[in-house]
């Protein structure tokens, strides 16, 4: 059984949180709510996406367009290896982090079932998922 206020679906527990956080803070928050908790992961070819979309649609404020999910592009091993004209190496990480949309959210269009990539610093409501206690 899931804790009070959480919804059960195919052996996992889910909860929508309206408070807006950036992606990393939302992920940390989910891990503090329940043992094994994370921002929601969604199997693409399953009814889980409809369940989660429904959960968000029923609970989100009408003005909100996005809800974070637990997907983030990790590009650590693909650092660009360009060089400056004087031969010194370039690291783009400090530039890229702020300018590339690496974190994924559910998008309001079509009922929160489609994913969109956003800036990770953007603050959005989110869905946590955890195994039952």
From Swiss-Prot:
SMART domains in alphabetical order: CLECT
GO MF terms held by the record: toxin activity
Cell compartments where the protein resides: Secreted
Naturally occurring in which organism (per UniProt): Bothrops jararaca (Jararaca)
Main location: secreted
Function: Snaclec that binds to von Willebrand factor (VWF) and induces its interaction with GPIbalpha (GP1BA) (via the vWF A1 domain), resulting in platelet aggregation.
Entry comment describing in which tissues the protein is expressed: Expressed by the venom gland.
Coiled coil region boundaries: none
Alphabetic keyword roster: Disulfide bond, Hemostasis impairing toxin, Platelet aggregation activating toxin, Secreted, Toxin
UniProt-recorded name of the protein: Snaclec botrocetin subunit alpha
Disulfide links within the chain: 2-13, 30-128, 103-120
Subunit structure: Heterodimer of subunits alpha and beta; disulfide-linked. Botrocetin and vWF form a soluble complex.
The keyword Disulfide bond is assigned to this record: yes
């Amino acid at each position: 059984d899931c804790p009070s206020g959480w919804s059960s679906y195919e052996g996992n527990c889910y909860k929508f949180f309206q408070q807006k956080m950036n992606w990393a803070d939302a992920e940390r928050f989910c891990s503090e709510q329940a043992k094994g908790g994370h921002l929601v992961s969604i199997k693409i070819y399953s009814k889980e996406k409809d369940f989660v979309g429904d959960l968000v649609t029923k609970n989100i404020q009408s003005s909100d367009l996005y809800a974070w999910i637990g997907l983030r592009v990790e590009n650590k091993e693909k650092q660009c290896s360009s060089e400056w004209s004087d031969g010194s190496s370039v690291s783009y990480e400090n530039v890229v982090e702020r300018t590339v949309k690496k974190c994924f959210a559910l998008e309001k269009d079509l009922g929160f079932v489609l994913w969109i990539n956003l800036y990770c610093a953007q603050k959005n409501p989110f869905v946590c998922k955890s195994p039952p206690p």
